[in-house]
Design a protein with these regions (language model features):
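Short beta-strand/loop motif that positions the catalytic acidic residue
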Residues: 224-226
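Mobile cap/lid helix-loop segments that gate and shape the active-site cleft of serine hydrolases
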Residues: 180-214, 220
Length: 243
């Protein structure tokens, strides 16, 4: 793979997670929120955020985690809303855990595992974010320090939790915001318009689904990681988003 350029757009202090330190100690958790799973992910804890088979959050704690609330990042895997696995971001989980950050890897409905459309994937992403905020204290996470990240279509989902307010699971409590504190986006799909990615699948609702069509001035800070050889998540689109 040839990567000629890595471009970072708008890095703010909230994204420099390593500045947040956690005191050493033991993590003691006992709750009926947690479930067993035969998935091959090496998560410390698994949560269920909705009633679908894919409605699971895989939680990875720092070895120095305490019962005090820590910052957290929820990651959404890529795969064109067609397929993929939360395992995609296990290496990022391992890295961020070293800095006292709790990492949550979200599963969600895709065309392959549920026969669904990109709209259901976004509904699930927002449900996952709301669930994480609602239950943050139970898993020793600071609800005001939850970031969202993802790659490709997962980057779209992360961005859309912040920008796209019209698409929601009707079962969600909309009084709970899905907006993260900040965004960590790897080659994200942010333009789903007529000249963007996936328009043929979302054309009937793209104005509510496409992050670049919904960005507001008060949007949370974001960092973009892009490669100039990427022909799907095109760099100039992200420059437009930054502007």
């Amino acid at each position: 793979m040839r990567i000629k350029l890595i471009r970072c757009i708008e890095l703010k202090a909230i994204v420099t997670l390593s500045l947040v330190l956690i005191n050493s100690g033991n993590l003691l958790i006992g709750s009926n929120l947690f479930i067993r799973d035969n998935n091959d992910l090496s998560a410390d804890t698994i949560l269920r955020y909705n009633h679908y088979p894919t409605g699971k959050l895989y939680v990875y704690y720092s070895k120095d985690q305490t019962n005090q609330s820590s910052p957290a990042v929820i990651f959404f895997f890529g795969g064109g809303w067609n397929s993929g696995s939360p395992k995609q971001f296990e290496s990022q989980a391992s890295y961020l855990n070293k800095y006292g950050v709790t990492v949550v890897l979200a599963d969600y409905r895709t065309q392959k595992n549920a026969g669904t459309t990109p709209k259901e994937a976004l509904m699930d992403a927002k449900s996952a974010m709301r669930y994480l905020k609602q239950h943050a204290m139970s898993i020793h996470v600071d609800p005001d320090k939850i970031l969202a990240g993802g790659g490709s279509a997962g980057g779209h989902l992360a961005a859309a939790t912040a920008f796209c307010h019209q698409i929601n699971n009707p079962e969600d409590d909309l009084n709970v915001s899905s907006i993260p504190k900040a965004l960590i986006l790897f080659n994200p799909v942010i333009d789903n318009g007529p000249h963007g990615y996936g328009f043929d699948r979302v054309k009937d609702y793209y104005r509510d689904f496409s992050p670049i069509h919904n960005i507001k001035k008060d949007a949370p800070p974001a960092i973009f990681f892009l490669g100039s050889e990427d022909n799907i998540a095109v760099s100039y689109t992200h420059l437009r988003a930054h502007e």
